[in-house]
Swiss-Prot record:
Gene3D superfamilies: Leucyl/phenylalanyl-tRNA-protein transferase, C-terminal domain, Leucyl/phenylalanyl-tRNA-protein transferase, N-terminal domain
This protein's record includes keyword Transferase: yes
EC numbers: 2.3.2.6
Keywords: Acyltransferase, Cytoplasm, Transferase
Family that this chain belongs to: Belongs to the L/F-transferase family.
Gene expressing this chain: aat
CC annotations in GO: cytoplasm
NCBIfam families: aat
Catalysis performed (reactions): N-terminal L-lysyl-[protein] + L-leucyl-tRNA(Leu) = N-terminal L-leucyl-L-lysyl-[protein] + tRNA(Leu) + H(+); N-terminal L-arginyl-[protein] + L-leucyl-tRNA(Leu) = N-terminal L-leucyl-L-arginyl-[protein] + tRNA(Leu) + H(+); L-phenylalanyl-tRNA(Phe) + an N-terminal L-alpha-aminoacyl-[protein] = an N-terminal L-phenylalanyl-L-alpha-aminoacyl-[protein] + tRNA(Phe)
Superkingdom assignment: Bacteria
One Gene Ontology MF term: leucyl-tRNA--protein transferase activity
Function: Functions in the N-end rule pathway of protein degradation where it conjugates Leu, Phe and, less efficiently, Met from aminoacyl-tRNAs to the N-termini of proteins containing an N-terminal arginine or lysine.
Name of the featured protein: Leucyl/phenylalanyl-tRNA--protein transferase
Organism: Burkholderia lata (strain ATCC 17760 / DSM 23089 / LMG 22485 / NCIMB 9086 / R18194 / 383)
Length: 254
């Protein structure tokens, strides 16, 4: 039985999330509200909302958890070529927090294979825009010839980044945004990006699963650290474009 949370009810222990033998593995709780205070509390505990229009707010903590370690990001030869072009050609820009609501709306409208509709509802956009205004949500945006052609958004507390969604209106535009984010996080020494759930696309870029217990332990430590700066641009990509580029090994378990 999934517990229903009233406005003042705390989240149950994450170990009570539904298991793999159920129809909704990782489902922890449901509620009627998506208040910013509830959303912040969720992220600090390694919990995230995911639901569709017409459903209550559903809160998840899957086991295992999909992550991307910046030091393990895979740059294919074709992506490296693209990143070099982005660095070389002035019509390409990567902007941070220039149009956060616009990126969210674009992610909501992006077609997803095997998915009808979107989980990025108006309520979700309002809640995450509130986090953006408080400095805890960010967008990384790929621009070409003055037009936004791709990007991603996510949540950040301390030295932890929680990826939410990405979109592309031009080839590799979302990968350019992700690579720029990864390069910045590597530069800052950040060890983990939360990717929530396993997809073949994320796996192709170096994403992998870890046990929920290890994920939550890392989150608790990382969110207690001072926040990292969020001013950067495409120049950080230079660290990813060399043939022998490498980052220090991470301490994240395999």
């Amino acid at each position: 039985m999934v517990p229903w949370l009233g406005p003042d009810d705390p989240f149950p222990p994450i170990e009570r999330a539904l298991g793999p033998a159920t129809g909704a593995p990782g489902l922890l709780a449901a509620s009627a509200d998506l208040l910013p205070s509830r959303l912040i509390d969720a992220y600090l505990r390694g919990i995230f909302p995911w639901y569709s229009d017409g459903q209550p707010v559903l809160w998840w903590s899957p086991d295992p958890r999909m992550i991307l370690v910046p030091a393990e990001f895979k740059v294919s030869p074709s992506l490296r070529k693209t990143l070099k072009r982005v660095l070389r050609e002035p019509e390409w820009e990567v902007r941070v927090d220039h149009d956060f609501p616009g990126v969210m709306r674009a992610c909501a409208q992006a077609p997803r294979r095997g998915q009808r509709g979107t989980w990025i509802t108006a309520e979700i956009i309002d809640a995450y825009t509130s986090l953006y205004r408080s400095g805890n949500a960010h967008s990384i945006e790929t621009w070409h010839d003055g037009r936004r052609v791709g990007g991603l958004y996510g949540v950040s507390f301390g030295r932890m980044f929680f990826g939410e969604s990405m979109y592309a209106d031009a080839t590799d535009a979302s990968k350019i945004a992700l690579a720029t984010l990864v390069a910045h996080l590597r530069e800052q020494g950040l060890e983990m990006i939360d990717c929530q759930q396993n997809t073949s696309h994320l796996a192709s870029l170096g994403g992998r699963e870890i046990a929920r217990k290890a994920f939550v332990a890392h989150v608790r430590s990382a969110v207690a650290e001072p926040p990292i700066p969020w001013q950067f641009d495409k120049r950080v990509l230079a660290a990813l474009t060399g043939r022998a580029e490498a980052a220090a090994p991470s301490g994240i378990e395999r």
